[in-house]
Amino acid sequence: MTTFYNCNFFDGATEHNTENAWFTVDDHTGRITARGTGTPTSADQQVDFHGQYVMPGFFNVHTHITAGPDTPDGSYGHTEAESAVFATQNMHQLLQSGVTYIRQCGTEYDVDIALKRMQQDGKLPHTPHMMTSGKAFSMTGGHGDSSHGGHAVDSPGEMRKAVRTAFKNGAESIKVMATGGVMTPNDFMEDPQLSVAEMHVAVEESHHKRRIVAAHAEGNPGIQNAIDAGVDSIEHGFYVNEQEAHQMVAQGTYLTPTLIAEWAAAKDGIGVLPAWEIKKAEDALDDTYVNLSRAFQIGVKFTCGTDAGTPFNGFDQTPHEFEMLTKIGMTPAQAYQCSSINSANLLGVADDYGTLEVGKFADFQVLKADPVADVHAVVQADKQVYLGGHREF
């Protein structure tokens, strides 16, 4: 047993810190066995945090670990071996930034599935927990149609077979493309792509296996199509309207806004990215905060995801997403709960991960400043990061 003490403790389940706190972790299981305030219980080892701030590790439920944020096209076109090396490096960077759990949303060559097997065999240290997706699903010629990064399907029957094959190969979740995207030259965010019937088949097959479906859906009518198909999360959702927000609340559909992705492309892409791509990102920014603020007020549950790997959107940027979430009306604590509560619930792992409660895994980060008082505190570069009570960085 190891007891960590003399800290300000934000468990992610409430909206406040607990002062002069301690918590004990079973060194073998990695789970929290007890917590309290004042004088800590006896333990084999004790770690004094000297009044620093402890909070849960972050979820990032929208990552592309095989992509390269330092290239205009996301580095697509690399070999499978190169993709695996880059993915491993990117996972290290995610963990170092405080991200302890990720969900992939489309992966070249199904590299994430191979890396997950290595994780389970203990051969991939210093990487966050991962829910795999394998390749994404798009229509022929649509957003995400890539020789090594996507399944092109053009009917419900093709979708059914492709999803079943993906699960056979080891995918743990499914990503479908409901609309065009910022990075695709031949379409627009308002272009509908996969049909309701096609996406519904993906949902049906996934839910049979207690798996979840994420839909890339930036504009309309694609957002509405994805909601009607019953997907579990809308990714991006820049143009979500009032009617859709109410339907999402009724159905329990989550929204992953990936705010930093469009901000980074519009801010840092000038002179590097094509003009059409910059314009798409800038156009979305004009409306995004109004639309998402309304959705939040209506009661849509937001998750934390950044689209990491897209241009200028690095794997160390997750902490910056929380500042952007506060701009749509959240307090810092509510922004963090998009990660600690909502993201864990979306992925179906909230019994074990997310908040720092007794019985759950001790995946946490240690900060010098109070994250509840100042959302910028989580950007700290030299933070301590723990998985299962063991220090990783």
Label each region the model flagged:
Residues 2-3, 9-55:
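Histidine-rich, glycine-flanked metal-binding segment
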Residues 52-118, 123, 197, 229:
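Metal-associated gating/positioning segment near the N- to mid-region
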Residues 66-69, 105-111, 138-139, 180-184, ...:
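Active-site environment of divalent metal-dependent phosphoester hydrolases
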Residues 67-83, 92-95, 127, 134, ...:
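Active-site gating loops and adjacent loop-to-helix segments of metal-dependent hydrolytic enzymes
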Residues 86-112, 127-136, 171-184, 212, ...:
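Divalent metal-dependent hydrolysis catalytic cores, especially in the metallo-beta-lactamase
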Residues 100, 104-150, 157-162:
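Mid-domain alpha/beta scaffold segments of enzyme catalytic cores
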Residues 114, 157-255, 271-272, 279-302, ...:
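Histidine/acidic residue-rich metal-binding segments in metalloenzymes
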Residues 208, 273, 285-370:
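His/Asp/Glu-enriched, well-ordered alpha-helical/loop segment
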